[in-house]
Structures are given as structure tokens and as C-alpha cells.
Amino acid sequence: MTQLTQSSCWQALIADAAKLPHMRDLFAQNPQRFEQMSLNACGLFLDYSKNRADETTLKLLFSLAKEAKLTEKIAAMFNGDIINTTEQRAVLHTALRSKACQDIRVDGVNIVPEVQQTLDKMAQFVDSVQTGQCKGYTGKRITDIVSIGIGGSFLGPKIVSQALRPYWKAGLNCHFVANVDASSICEKLKLLNAETTLFVMSSKSFGTQETLTNTLSAKDWFLDQGATQADIAKHFVAVTSNVTKATEFGMDADNIFPMWDWVGGRYSLWSAIGLPIALLIGMDNFRLLLDGAHQMDEHVKAAPLEQNMPVIMALLSVLYTNFHGAQSHVVLTYDHYLRGLPAYFQQLDMESNGKSVTLNGTQVDYSTGPVIWGGEGTNGQHAYHQLLHQGTALIPADFIMPLQSHNPLGEHHAQLASNCFGQTQALMQGRTFEEAMAELSQSSLNEADKTLIAKHKVMLGNKPSNTLLMDKLTPQTLGSLIALYEHRTLVQGAIWQINSFDQWGVELGKQLGNDVLARIGAAHNATELDSSSNALINRFRQGKI
């Protein structure tokens, strides 16, 4: 066993999980349970009372965090220590939402002034587009933005832009392209007018295969519409570290925005990668997004573990992953604008914590990152919620809902809220056989049929969930919410003693993909790989099965 699983705290949590009463009983025994297991922070309210935990469980979890030196690990990230040890990098996405007066250093240099300069540069560009000062090659104002990226440079801007749709500047629309599948970009280009379209290309190296391929195709389309090479500077901007390649492409050096090694892709929406967001919602709202995240940064640094929202959520996830056998976690957003968040949190969590060796290279003997999935309420209630209620797998859930709607229409929002809260109650409470029989008592069925149907209507309950509320979905509350899950991911990784900030599995996929591409384009059939890979490559070369 590893040192972690041998610890007395770990062993005590195993014993505690086996003997804890049903949540129905925990609520019955403690009328103050909700008050004791809920908290406010940074415009968010967390109810974690519907979890398989009592005072003893929580004390053990906080002890586990202290044994892991969690407070010191959180501080190390904020201080710019090299916590991404396999790539020898600091992890400072938090610096992107820092205040101008802060001093945050990488290699002895304060990086805050450069961050602020980039924000100011973004503000000038955003203002020029939104006011119509920035015009296309025929003098028409920009109406459409195409964001081209992959991974964090695609998903973050897309999901945040989608979530903040009520704040979009009138007259601007945005389209997001990531997949190298030609159908993705072709379908987008069919909707566009080259004279009024702005392309934002995001790639640290300016060489990411999918992003570069899509950008080159966009350039070809642009030139085919009647534009010239000289017109590219008015319609293409880049977020990249490789200024040379971007200028060779035809971009104006003034419209090239920086990226830094101390920001990982899945944490980059706060940087110039968020330019598409800022173009849509304006720089003032983008700064509010940053401010909400900064508030959560200050909270995770300063709040005691027992009152620390990201810490509590992370420890509860560890509880289910390691002591209750949960293999997945569902995120359920009861707000149409937040429908993309499960996919964003999926990338954030699974790319960060899908690891199987500790920081010192030891193979883990415990589960790490669970599968993250989810969707939009109430749609899921007519699909996968059935499995949550009566399936054999334990799947902890996060319910997320604003108390106020951007579209207050009739009783829509009241019905949405009633479904959200009703689901959390049903998951916790379940339905006993006796309750099912009582519901059938007035039916005309005979006793044997009543008994049979009652067995099918039993729900064990004791299914855990968190409920996250906010007054209203705003740039600030969204910033807090995303930063909450970022820090939750950090805390999980700290407990599991893994590096949450590299992604070698992703890198291997890129490497092998490039090798396969070369074989697809070779003069002869593939023969050097395994029989399956050879056959698949050769079938593709033939264009038929």
C-alpha cells in the first residue's frame, strides 16, 4: 500500500463509510443539518447537507487534508512555486485575474504588469470592434467572429460566451471551430460574409495541428471570396507565443496577443484566450468575470478548511471516489445558458486528475479522477436521471441553478426550481417498499400485483448531491463558479498526490496521430504497426471498407 492508503485517517474513513446511517436518518437526527452544512462565498451558496457525511466524516476529511499539507500546497500555487514538476512550470492562471497592485513573480520577474498590459491591449481592440472603428477590407463593420482553437483555447471561450449570452453586444455573433473534421469549419463558413468576419486564432506555438489546419482553410476561403493577402491583417488576429509565425501568416503585430508557459490550456480563458468572450460581452464585463474568479481565489487562500467551498466540494468527491466506489460524477445545470458547463468541467477535471502515478512516480493503489458528465435540467430528468435514482452505480451529483432568470416568463423558473430541488430530495430520500405499497393501496390490483409493482417502485435513496445557487447568472458569479471548480480540481490532486497540471496522455495521442498521418500519406500501405492499426490505415487509404 502507498503511504496515503496506510494512513490512520484513510483507514478511519473506510470504517466510517461502512457504518454511516442513511441520509434520511441523518436529517431526522439533526434538525440543524442544513444550517451546519451550507455556506456562502463569492456570490455562491453551497448546500452540501445531502451528502453521506456527518460531523465525524467531515472531521476525518479535514484531517486528511491537513495530513496532505493542503494549505501549504494551495499557497505554493499562488506563490508561483514549480508545482507542475514534470514540465518544470509554475501554475499561475490565478495571476490572470489578480489586481494591478499585486506582486507575483516567475523567475524573479513580476508578471502582473504584463498581464495588465495585455488586458489593456485587449480593451483597445475590443472597443475598436464594438464601436465599428475596426472595419473589414471593404469598409464594413465586423458582424461575426470565428474563434479557432482546440482544447482549453476552444472550450473555455465557447462555454463562457454561451453562458453570458444575455450580455452580448448587439450586432455581433460568434462561431467556434475546434475539430479538424472539415465539416465543422465548412458549415460555419457557409453562414459568413468574408467582408464582415473576424477570425481569432489561438495556439501557443502557432502550430497546433487542428488549429493551424482550420486557420489555413479559413484563410483559403477568405481569399477565395475576393480578398487579397494584404487584407488578412484586417480579418485575422492571433493569441500565440510565436509572433514570427503569426506575422508571416499575414497578421498585424499589433493584433497578436501573448500566451505564457505558466498558464495551462484548460485554465486559459482568463487570458487573451478569452478575447472572443471580451469581444462579445465587452471589456467591462470581462473584467467582472475576472473579478468573480479573483474573489474565489482569495476565498480558497484565506478561508479555514472547514469553511472553504472548493475544499469541501473536493473532499466530498474524494470521499465518494475512494471510500464509496463511485466512478463518475454528474453535473446538472438548471439554467439553459449553463448547459455547456458539464463539458467544460469534464475537461478541467479529467485532463487534470486522470493520472495513475504520484508526484514521486509511485503507481497509485487508489482511484483518482472520476468520469465527469452531465447535462441540462430538466432534460436529463427524462433520460439518465432514471439511472441516478434506481441504477446500481453510486453517482454523486452537483445541481447548479440561479435563483433569478434572465427571462422571467410566467411560471417557467418556478417550475425549473421545483424540479431541481425535487430531484435532490428524491435522490436523498428515495422511496421505501412500505411507501410504495401505501401509494398502491387504493388501486384495484390484487395483493400479489401490488407487491410486485411496489418492488419496482422502490428507490433506495441515500444518493448524494450538492446544490449550488447564485442570485443571478452574471459575469461575476460565473467567474466565481468556474474558479470554484478549478480549485476543487487542485485540492483533489493534492489529496491524491498527483500532478494535476500536465497531460502526457494527450501528448502521446498527438505524437501517434502525427505518425499515423505520415503513414496515410506514404507511397505504400502501412505494414510496420500492429495488425489492427495497419488495417485501419490501409482501409482509409482505399476509401472503402
Curated annotation (Swiss-Prot):
Molecular functions per Gene Ontology: carbohydrate derivative binding; glucose-6-phosphate isomerase activity; monosaccharide binding
Gene responsible for this protein: pgi
Taxonomic classification: Bacteria, Pseudomonadati, Pseudomonadota, Gammaproteobacteria, Alteromonadales
Protein name: Glucose-6-phosphate isomerase
Active site residues per record: 351, 382, 510
Species per Swiss-Prot/TrEMBL record: Shewanella denitrificans (strain OS217 / ATCC BAA-1090 / DSM 15013)
InterPro entries in the cross-refs: G6P_Isomerase, G6P_Isomerase_C, Phosphoglucose_isomerase_CS, SIS_dom_sf, SIS_PGI_1, SIS_PGI_2
Domain of life: Bacteria
This protein's GO CC annotations: cytosol
Location of this chain's protein in the cell: Cytoplasm
Keywords: Cytoplasm, Gluconeogenesis, Glycolysis, Isomerase
PROSITE patterns recorded: P_GLUCOSE_ISOMERASE_1, P_GLUCOSE_ISOMERASE_2, P_GLUCOSE_ISOMERASE_3
Pathway: Carbohydrate biosynthesis; gluconeogenesis; Carbohydrate degradation; glycolysis; D-glyceraldehyde 3-phosphate and glycerone phosphate from D-glucose: step 2/4
EC number, UniProt record: 5.3.1.9
Signal peptide range in chain numbering: none
Gene Ontology biological process terms in this record: gluconeogenesis; glucose 6-phosphate metabolic process; glycolytic process
Function: Catalyzes the reversible isomerization of glucose-6-phosphate to fructose-6-phosphate.
